[in-house]
C-alpha cells in the first residue's frame, strides 16, 4: 500500500488521493469498484456531452447530468455522517458532503478536459471554473447551483461573523492535500461521534502521516485511545499536548483528563 506521506496529492486527481486515504483507514475499502464506477460515469458523460460545444455549455450539461439524471445530492437523513464522506457509499447512495460530491464531479469534469478547480471557502468546499471570456463561474457542489459573490458574502456573515468580508483570496484554488486533510478531519470527528473508535484512530494515524508531531492531532489520538481504554498510550499523547501547548485554553481540560486516567490506573492496580 502506498504511504500517504510519500504520495504527491497535488499532482494527482483529488479522487485518487481520497481513495488512497480511504484505503489507509478501511481495510475493506473497495478501491477498484470505486474506480470502475467513476469510469462508468465518465463514459456516460462522454456519450452525452460533445467536446465541440462551448465550455459553458459542456459544464451546464454535465451539471444537469450529475444532479439530474444521476441523482447526486446533499446527504439528507443519512444515518451516519461518515457515509457522506466514504467515496464508495457516496457513489452507491448518490448522497454526499460538499467535498465528496465535489471530488466526484471534479473527476468527471477533468476527464472531459473541463478546468474545474476546488476552492476551500471559509464555510465549505466550492468549485470554480474560468471561462474563455475571463468570467469566473462558482458552483455549489451540494446542488450544482451557481454562486454569486453576494451569496458568498451572505454565507460569510451568517456563518463566520457579521463583520466578515469576502476577499479574492477566498476564491483561490485549493491544494488537493489541503482538501484531503479537511476531509479526514471531518471524517475523524464523525467517526468519534458515531463511536467507531477503531476507524477514528486509523483516521487520526492517517492525519499524523502528514505532520507526525502535530500536538493537536496527537491530542485527538490520545482522546481516542482513552475511549478505547488504552490508558498508557493515551497518557503519553495527552501529556505531549500539554507540554507542547501549555497556554492553550483546552490544556486545563486535558490536564483533568490526564488526572482521571492516572487515578483510574492507580485504582485498577
From Swiss-Prot:
Give the highest taxon in the source lineage.
Answer: Bacteria
Indicate the secretion signal residues. Answer: none
Family designation: Belongs to the UPF0162 family.
**Protein known as:** UPF0162 protein YchA
Q: List the source organism.
A: Escherichia coli (strain K12)
